[in-house]
């Protein structure tokens, strides 16, 4: 009995220690909650969707956090980037309209401004931390409106602070994101509606903006590091967008290729592909070349996690900057000089042709490259309404309309002018010349023809 009593007494101090630690942790959670939750915003944008061949407006839900006393809110581009009307509910449950200031699909960041006229409450501002100082295993809180449940808080840890995703990841609007940044991975619960909300450390500082969740697995959420967000918001507040330089290079991690290319460990960036007509292609670079230096500074992307730093080394320069690249091809090294160009918009403006039953988009250079189009003339068909005139005329999503009744369509403005003129004139039959998979074909829009749904058997 004495021995059993002795063992039991030895365990008591441990119990008290655990209780004290739990109390301290709980207090830290409360502190972090109280510092950030008042700045949390429940966002209800009304977005426009053109993908079905007609303009549809729908209400969605997201989150955001106030980062400036004038009422500026940071959220995700995929939450508010396509919004025409935005309403924000603050922590005191007051709802205010907000204006879209600008966004950056490449990092999935957007900025809103609350309309504070007539609002007599207090604007609480969250403190933005330093994502470069975070640690794997660090305790964090995720705040937002999961499944539209506003003012929600979940807890977890930082699982990884430098997760990389290829730039082929696309936002719901179709734009690519992820090339220029790494992601914070957390096991704190993140669901639909959490997007745009803050990831918070236990000191009550925002270290990331929640952006992505993996719904095929539990406890896998991802946030944009707050230092990336800071850079994006500064540019958006100044210009409404983020300006980047571009040379048209897609890079690949070099680790598995070092023996073949004969490069030193941690030296060089492998060119996997080049965009046609890009500065790099015009300067004579080729897939398989290894970039060793930019303006005399060594560069390396041995691992995929190092690729964003390489892209940013170019993108962060003003467009029109002359740069010098030291390049290795085979066993030879040479210097290539070129000039950067603006990256430009990832996607063009959308437009609905309601009478024809289709939606189109202006073609940007990045769209031309992504869709392997011959050039950027014409308009890109983003949607065809089922059994509408365009559908019955044989148009498909992804077609490029080059001519309308033999008139060339250089861009969306030319198309709008032609469409409105034909509509005003009451023209019922229109001939379209379209490009599909590199081939040209004719499609006829017949406004006197109407399709009918066939009954299901």
Predicted regions and their residues:
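C-terminal structural cap/anchor segments
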Residues: 345, 352-393, 397
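Conserved catalytic motifs of ABC-family nucleotide-binding domains
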Residues: 288, 398
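Serine-dependent protease modules
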Residues: 20-283, 287, 293-321, 329-333, ...
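Bacterial N-terminal signal peptides
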Residues: 7-16
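Positively charged n-region of N-terminal signal peptides that target proteins for export
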Residues: 1-4
């Amino acid at each position: 009995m004495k021995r059993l009593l002795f063992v039991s007494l030895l365990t008591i101090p441990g119990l008290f220690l655990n209780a004290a630690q739990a109390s301290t942790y709980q207090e830290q959670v409360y502190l972090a909650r109280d510092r950030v939750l008042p700045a949390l915003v429940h966002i209800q944008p009304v977005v426009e969707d053109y993908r079905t061949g007609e303009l549809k407006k729908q209400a969605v839900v997201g989150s955001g956090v106030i980062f400036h006393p004038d009422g500026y809110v940071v959220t995700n581009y995929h939450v508010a980037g396509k919004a025409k009307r935005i309403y924000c509910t603050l922590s005191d449950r007051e709802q205010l309209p907000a204006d879209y200031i600008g966004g950056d699909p490449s990092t999935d960041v957007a900025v809103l401004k609350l309309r504070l006229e007539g609002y007599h409450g207090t604007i609480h501002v969250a403190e933005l931390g330093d994502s470069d100082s975070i640690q794997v295993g660090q305790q964090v809180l995720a705040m937002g409106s999961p499944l539209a449940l506003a003012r929600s808080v979940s807890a977890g840890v930082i699982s990884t602070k430098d997760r990389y995703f290829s730039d082929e990841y696309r936002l719901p609007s179709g734009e690519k994101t992820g090339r220029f940044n790494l992601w914070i991975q957390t096991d704190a619960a993140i669901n639909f509606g959490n997007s745009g909300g803050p990831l918070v450390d236990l000191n009550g500082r925002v270290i990331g903006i929640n952006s992505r969740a993996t719904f095929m697995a539990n406890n896998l959420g991802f946030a944009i590091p707050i230092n990336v967000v800071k850079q994006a918001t500064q540019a958006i507040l100044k210009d409404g967008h983020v300006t980047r330089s571009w040379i048209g290079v897609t890079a690949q991690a070099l680790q598995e290729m070092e023996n073949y290319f004969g490069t030193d460990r941690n030296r060089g960036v492998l060119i996997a592909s080049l965009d046609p007509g890009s500065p790099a292609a015009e300067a004579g670079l080729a897939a398989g070349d290894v970039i060793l230096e930019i303006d005399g500074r060594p560069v390396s992307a041995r691992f995929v996690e190092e690729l964003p730093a390489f892209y940013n080394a170019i993108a962060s320069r003003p467009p029109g900057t002359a740069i010098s690249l030291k390049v290795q091809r085979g066993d030879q090294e040479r210097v290539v000089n070129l000039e950067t160009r603006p990256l430009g918009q990832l996607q063009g403006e959308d437009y609905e042709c309601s009478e024809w039953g289709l939606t189109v988009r202006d073609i940007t250079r990045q769209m031309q490259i992504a869709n392997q189009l011959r050039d950027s003339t014409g308009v890109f068909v983003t949607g065809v309404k089922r059994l509408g005139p365009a559908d019955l005329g044989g148009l498909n999503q992804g077609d490029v309309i080059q001519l309308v009744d033999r008139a060339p369509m250089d861009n969306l403005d030319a198309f709008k002018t032609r469409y409105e003129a034909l509509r005003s004139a009451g023209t019922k039959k229109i001939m379209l010349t379209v490009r599909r998979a590199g081939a040209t074909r004719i499609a006829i829009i017949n406004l006197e023809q109407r399709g009918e749904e066939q009954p299901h058997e």
